[in-house]
C-alpha cells in the first residue's frame, strides 16, 4: 500500500484529513519526522490558522519539504496548506511562503459579502490534471477562508468566484505539488474523489 504522510507541524485539522483518506482506502501516517516525510509516497500539508504562525512552525522542516517537492512525488496542501505553498502572503504583514508555487496570497477586499468565505461554492476547472480526474466542472466544494490565492497565477488548476475570482486549486510547473483552498475532506463525494485521485497519483 502507498504510504501517505499527513504533515504534523502544529497546525491543522489532521484527524478529518486522516478520516477522509481512510474512507478512500488509504492508511495515512501523521508525522513531522523528516525521515518519514522523505520516505512517503505522498505528502499532505493540512492547515487551519494564520499564515505567519504556519511559516514559523514549518521553518524547522522547510528544507525537508523543499527536498520532497524536488523529488517529484505528489504533495497536496489543503486550505492554509495551499497558501503556504505560495510565494508570499499579505496576512498580518508581508510574509514569505515556501515558494514552491508562484503566486500571492491576498486578503478578500471589504464588500457586502461576508468574510471569511464559509460554505459551499462551485469551482471551474482550468486545466486537465490527475487531481481532478472524473470531477465535473462546476462541482460544489466546501470553503472556510479569509485570504485567497490570486488567479493571476498561471498555476491555477481550478477557480472559484466569491466577489472576485480566486484560485480554488493550484499546481506547480512539474505537476507534483498541488493545493486546494477548499477542504476535500469536508466536500462530500466530490472531495473524497479528489482525495482518491491524489492517492492514485502516489
Swiss-Prot record:
One of the GO BP terms on file: L-histidine biosynthetic process
InterPro entries listed in its UniProt record: Class_I_gatase-like (IPR029062), GATASE (IPR017926), Imidazole-glycPsynth_HisH (IPR010139)
Record pathway: Amino-acid biosynthesis; L-histidine biosynthesis; L-histidine from 5-phospho-alpha-D-ribose 1-diphosphate: step 5/9
Highest taxon in the source lineage: Archaea
Keyword Hydrolase belongs to the record: yes
Annotated localization: Cytoplasm
Gene Ontology CC annotation, any one: cytoplasm
GO molecular function list: glutaminase activity; imidazoleglycerol-phosphate synthase activity; lyase activity
Keywords noted in UniProt: Amino-acid biosynthesis, Cytoplasm, Glutamine amidotransferase, Histidine biosynthesis, Hydrolase, Lyase
A family per Pfam: GATase
Annotated catalytic residues: 79 (nucleophile), 183, 185
UniProt main location, coarse: cytoplasm
Coiled coil: none
Positions of the Glutamine amidotransferase type-1 domain: 3-202
Catalytic activity line of the entry: 5-[(5-phospho-1-deoxy-D-ribulos-1-ylimino)methylamino]-1-(5-phospho-beta-D-ribosyl)imidazole-4-carboxamide + L-glutamine = D-erythro-1-(imidazol-4-yl)glycerol 3-phosphate + 5-amino-1-(5-phospho-beta-D-ribosyl)imidazole-4-carboxamide + L-glutamate + H(+); L-glutamine + H2O = L-glutamate + NH4(+)
EC assignment: 4.3.2.10, 3.5.1.2
Quaternary structure, from the entry: Heterodimer of HisH and HisF.
Protein function: IGPS catalyzes the conversion of PRFAR and glutamine to IGP, AICAR and glutamate. The HisH subunit catalyzes the hydrolysis of glutamine to glutamate and ammonia as part of the synthesis of IGP and AICAR. The resulting ammonia molecule is channeled to the active site of HisF.
Designated name of the protein: Imidazole glycerol phosphate synthase subunit HisH
Species annotation: Methanosarcina barkeri (strain Fusaro / DSM 804)
Upper classification of the organism: Archaea, Methanobacteriati, Methanobacteriota, Stenosarchaea group, Methanomicrobia
Amino acid at each position: 500500500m502507498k504510504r501517505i504522510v499527513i504533515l504534523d507541524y502544529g497546525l491543522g485539522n489532521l484527524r478529518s484529513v486522516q478520516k477522509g483518506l481512510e474512507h478512500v482506502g488509504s492508511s495515512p501516517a501523521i508525522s513531522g519526522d523528516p525521515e518519514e516525510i522523505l520516505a512517503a509516497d505522498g505528502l499532505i500539508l493540512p492547515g487551519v490558522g494564520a499564515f505567519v504562525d504556519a511559516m514559523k512552525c514549518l521553518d524547522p522542516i522547510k528544507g525537508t519539504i523543499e527536498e520532497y517537492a524536488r523529488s517529484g512525488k505528489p504533495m497536496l496542501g489543503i486550505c492554509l496548506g495551499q497558501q503556504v505553498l505560495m510565494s508570499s502572503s499579505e496576512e498580518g504583514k508581508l510574509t514569505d511562503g515556501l515558494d514552491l508555487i508562484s503566486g500571492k496570497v491576498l486578503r478578500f477586499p471589504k464588500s457586502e459579502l461576508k468574510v471569511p468565505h464559509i460554505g459551499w461554492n462551485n469551482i471551474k476547472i482550468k486545466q486537465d490534471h490527475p487531481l481532478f480526474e472524473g470531477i465535473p466542472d462546476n462541482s460544489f466544494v466546501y470553503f472556510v477562508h479569509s485570504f485567497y490565492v490570486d488567479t493571476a497565477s498561471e498555476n491555477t488548476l481550478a477557480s472559484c468566484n466569491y466577489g472576485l475570482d480566486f484560485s480554488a486549486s493550484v499546481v506547480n510547473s512539474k505537476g507534483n505539488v498541488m493545493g486546494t483552498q477548499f477542504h476535500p475532506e469536508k466536500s462530500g463525494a466530490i472531495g473524497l474523489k479528489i482525495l482518491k485521485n491524489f492517492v492514485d497519483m502516489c
